[in-house]
Amino acid sequence: MPICPLGKVIVFPPVSLAMEDGLLAVGGDLSPYRLLEAYRQGIFPWYSPGEPILWWAPQPRFVLFPDEILLSRSMRQILRKKHFQVTLDRNFDAVIHACATIGRPAQEGTWITEEMQEAYSILHELGYAHSVEVWRDRGLIGGLYGVSLGGCFFGESMFSRESNASKAALIFLSSLLKILRFTLIDCQVYTSHLALLGARFIPRETFTALIRKSLRRPTLRGNWSTHPETADKLPGHEF
């Protein structure tokens, strides 16, 4: 099956036409409208510097259900000691820049180009992209970012400058999304780091069906640290 080239019109082929490795389409742009339409269909961009924009819809899909997150005994002990302070949407640009320069566990190099950073910063300004920051002594030591639509959070990347900082970010996010009754966190592709925290594969058809169902609820747009639907539901800020 040939890879579908994208033009100026914001339309994607059915995800069922993706190649065996999940590659679905090539080209287009990273405008907010195209990115949001991609996420609504279970598609995400992922490409290396110097490559055209590549769009993916893997089969199966790696996801984390907020009520299925796993905490090891050692991680529980770390969280009880309150080594970290965690915030939401306080410094999105710093988080995505750190993800671009540090990368996430089990990921070789980085794929977050300057073009990608600019595109997701615009989504953040529009209230769709969000960050979780993990601090120690006012220093940013970990975090993650992604896109929220309906009842789904589409995770993009995470980073750690200290052990367990990115885990703390994901645990914090999962706790919040469980309170908000979100359906799932999209982890896109397998990593052992996320598998240890409870992420698992589901069929692509199940994934897209869950997205469609979750989109029936309103999207929580805006800064989540002050949004009326999230600010009063935040779990403890100190881990």
Swiss-Prot record:
One of its GO terms (biological process) is protein catabolic process. It is found in: Cytoplasm. It comes from the Bacteria. GO terms for molecular function: leucyl-tRNA--protein transferase activity. GO terms for cellular component: cytoplasm. Its main location: cytoplasm. Keywords: Acyltransferase, Cytoplasm, Transferase. It catalyses: N-terminal L-lysyl-[protein] + L-leucyl-tRNA(Leu) = N-terminal L-leucyl-L-lysyl-[protein] + tRNA(Leu) + H(+); N-terminal L-arginyl-[protein] + L-leucyl-tRNA(Leu) = N-terminal L-leucyl-L-arginyl-[protein] + tRNA(Leu) + H(+); L-phenylalanyl-tRNA(Phe) + an N-terminal L-alpha-aminoacyl-[protein] = an N-terminal L-phenylalanyl-L-alpha-aminoacyl-[protein] + tRNA(Phe). The keyword Cytoplasm applies. It holds the Pfam family Leu_Phe_trans. Its EC number is 2.3.2.6. It is an enzyme of class 2 (transferase). Belongs to the L/F-transferase family. Functions in the N-end rule pathway of protein degradation where it conjugates Leu, Phe and, less efficiently, Met from aminoacyl-tRNAs to the N-termini of proteins containing an N-terminal arginine or lysine. This is Leucyl/phenylalanyl-tRNA--protein transferase. It comes from Syntrophus aciditrophicus (strain SB).
